[in-house]
Amino acid sequence: MLGSTGSIGTQTLQIAEEFPEQFRVVALTAGQNLDLLVQQIQRHQPELVALANADLLPELQQRLDALGTDRKRPQLVGGPDGLNIAASWESADLVVTGIVGCAGLLPTLAAVRAGKDLALANKETLIAAGPVVLPELKKSGSRLLPADSEHSAIFQCLQGTPWAENARLSTGVPTPGLRRIQLTASGGAFRDWKAEDLENATVADATSHPNWSMGRKITVDSASLMNKGLEVIEAHYLFGLDYDHIEIVIHPQSIIHSMIELADSSVLAQLGWPDMKLPILYCLSWPSRLETPWRRLDLTEVGQLSFRAPDPAKYPCMQLAYAAGRAGGTMPAVMNAANEEAVAQFLEEKIHFLDIPVVIEAACERHKADLIAHPQLEDVLAVDQWARMAVREQVKRGTTRVPLAALAA
């Protein structure tokens, strides 16, 4: 479990506890939440624990020593190399990647190169490094199983088609018979706000999601619809469709998690309550399904399902993501890194919510002349660092916000 103390990690470990006959946790990685990590170590008794911050290893060792149990202690490793060791741990059959942002890229690649199957909750890995990751998947035979709700929904819908064998998510080639993907979006924290009212948006407003329980960064991405834009790029890499055939639909109830249209014009959808444990469980149990006592969907309780097209004037980040995806090469990596840095600056209240698309667009514009069409890993890592620095520099200079209508034009 990469990122065991985060939102995806804690929910994955809850599932492992619910199904002890099916799943055993062999390795955990975490950032710096030692309190929760120690509890997880006690509960799951992994063989290996990796800390992203190697400086915290002595403190973790002391805390484990203080427990004074007779149980076998896990091996402790730290830093980037430690994360890679955990990601390629020999006794692991499946690696769940829940590390937020581009920090998850190198451990994910380590897992792929070790031939591990992956439950991918870290969408930034494919977005920033799709041209690097997909050939590695083909080489190693690893399978990529999407752990976020939308791509899991698409994957599940494809299981009911004659092309299920092609939907292995390991090549990025077009899925035969798949005509269109419709990614559903809740609309995020500002779905019922008027575009002009976003001038008054605060960090507290942007981090209050109406439907899903998620981490702060992804909740802000949901509010800007950048999250859905990133998912468009991810869907392009996973299922091989071009951007003209991947659409975003606002669906406030978050009951339909995504839809696919097939060659005969029929549409398949996957439904369920908005609960991340459902797609995570499917990744862990695929191709089987495990019986759960979880709350069952009652459509009469839901009452109605509604849909509308997203307003480009209100969600400029969505347009930026489509543009970066179509540009290809290193542009998605630049856009993703610029967004990560912009959101971090917003959460620290150094910029306004409406500055987020402005600084992202500026970084993407600056990168156009230097775009690398067929990047190597080193190129992706280099432009990632460059884009973060470009955003920080712009924030220091001060942002010049432009009207929303101008951004959408």
Curated annotation (Swiss-Prot):
Domain of life: Bacteria
GO biological process: isopentenyl diphosphate biosynthetic process, methylerythritol 4-phosphate pathway involved in terpenoid biosynthetic process
Pfam families: DXP_redisom_C, DXP_reductoisom, DXPR_C
Residues that coordinate or bind Mn(2+): D148, E150, E231
Cofactor(s) required for function per UniProt: Mg(2+); Mn(2+)
Catalysis: reaction(s): 2-C-methyl-D-erythritol 4-phosphate + NADP(+) = 1-deoxy-D-xylulose 5-phosphate + NADPH + H(+)
Binding annotation for NADPH: T5, G6, S7, I8, G31, N33, N122, E124, G215
Keyword annotations of the record: Isoprene biosynthesis, Manganese, Metal-binding, NADP, Oxidoreductase
Pathway involvement of the protein, from the record: Isoprenoid biosynthesis; isopentenyl diphosphate biosynthesis via DXP pathway; isopentenyl diphosphate from 1-deoxy-D-xylulose 5-phosphate: step 1/6
EC number(s) per entry: 1.1.1.267
InterPro entries: DXP_reductoisomerase, DXP_reductoisomerase_C, DXP_reductoisomerase_N, DXPR_C, DXPR_C_sf, NAD(P)-bd_dom_sf
GO molecular function, one term: NADPH binding
Keyword flag Metal-binding: yes
Function: Catalyzes the NADPH-dependent rearrangement and reduction of 1-deoxy-D-xylulose-5-phosphate (DXP) to 2-C-methyl-D-erythritol 4-phosphate (MEP).
Family: Belongs to the DXR family.
Name of the protein: 1-deoxy-D-xylulose 5-phosphate reductoisomerase
Lineage per the UniProt record: Bacteria, Bacillati, Cyanobacteriota, Cyanophyceae, Synechococcales
UniProt gene name: dxr
